[in-house]
Amino acid sequence: MTTDDLKRLVRTVPDFPSPGILFRDITTLIAHGEGLSACIDHLAHKARAAGAQAVAGMEARGFIFGAAVAARMGLGFIPVRKPGKLPVKTIGIDYALEYGRDRLEIDPTAIREGQRVVIVDDLIATGGTALAAAELLRMAGAHVTHALFVIDLPELHGAERLRGAGLTVEALMDFPGH
């Protein structure tokens, strides 16, 4: 399947979670076996080209795509979690959201010093979470140069923000709006 075929599998839900928002729902994409498999193939191809030695994904939808890409490539997966979800000593990073703050944590023993880690997530909007994840992975010793997404919302400038921080950013598709 082409990326245009995959784009047609993404459902748009108007006015969710608030009026004026066009929510890009991946449920219809991941429910389509051939579509999900093709999506993982496309992302794995990009991760392989980036020289990935491991894949990281952010909770929650980044787990869907990141773990599948890692499995397809025979690589390990590093879950980037919300606070308090890991049963071991973690390292974390606080970061700003549009309205407030949040925190990400990882198990630093999941990363080897200098290991090339590619970030995979479902969607990039403002880029804040991906930027924080890249910084956190680097704090643990990872070499992070690439972030891959299924969907980019270019009007929110997240990809530009990540590129400005030195990351190569690729998405399988983009959609207008927020």
Curated annotation (Swiss-Prot):
Cell location: Cytoplasm
Major location category of this protein: cytoplasm
UniProt KW Cytoplasm keyword: yes
One Gene Ontology CC term in the entry: cytoplasm
GO molecular function: adenine binding; adenine phosphoribosyltransferase activity; AMP binding
A biological-process GO annotation: AMP salvage
EC number: 2.4.2.7
InterPro entries xrefs: Ade_phspho_trans, PRibTrfase_dom, PRTase-like, UPRTase/APRTase
Subunit and interaction comment: Homodimer.
UniProt protein name: Adenine phosphoribosyltransferase
Primary gene name: apt
